[in-house]
């Protein structure tokens, strides 16, 4: 579902860019009505892009909220990071979030963190 919003944002951004190029080519004196029409469409596109970006960010938040609701979470040690396969096999349903991923940045993580329904 996130891909739908992403593709729509891209399509609208491309249309907005095309409108900006059309406006640059128009003369305000000769084509004032066409310029005003493009300006109006530009405003609606900018509003729609802003709305879609908000929807896109809220979807990331839902995923982050789901992880934060999990009863157990803790930082993953360097030793555990070295043998991640063993850790994931020993803890059923473990989700590991790296701080440099979009989800990790959104959650404000400082270190690699594991989320699970069971203690680990």
From Swiss-Prot:
Extent of the signal sequence: none
InterPro entries tied to this protein: DUF2810 (IPR021230)
UniProt superkingdom: Bacteria
Keyword annotations from UniProtKB, A to Z: Cytoplasm
Subcellular location: Cytoplasm
GO cellular component, one term: cytosol
NCBIfam families: PRK11020.1
Name of the molecule in the record: Uncharacterized protein YibL
Native source organism of the sequence: Escherichia coli (strain K12)
Gene that produces this protein: yibL
């Amino acid at each position: 579902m996130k891909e739908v919003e992403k593709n729509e944002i891209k399509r609208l951004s491309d249309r907005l860019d095309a409108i900006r190029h059309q406006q640059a080519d128009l003369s305000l004196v000769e084509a004032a009505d066409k310029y005003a029409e493009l300006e109006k469409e530009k405003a609606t596109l900018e509003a729609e892009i802003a709305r879609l970006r908000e929807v896109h960010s809220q979807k990331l938040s839902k995923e982050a909220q789901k992880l934060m609701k999990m009863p157990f979470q803790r930082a993953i040690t360097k030793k555990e990071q070295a043998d991640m396969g063993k850790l994931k096999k020993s803890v059923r349903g473990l989700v590991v979030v790296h701080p440099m991923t979009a989800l990790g940045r959104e959650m404000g993580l400082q270190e690699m963190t594991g989320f699970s329904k069971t203690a680990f």
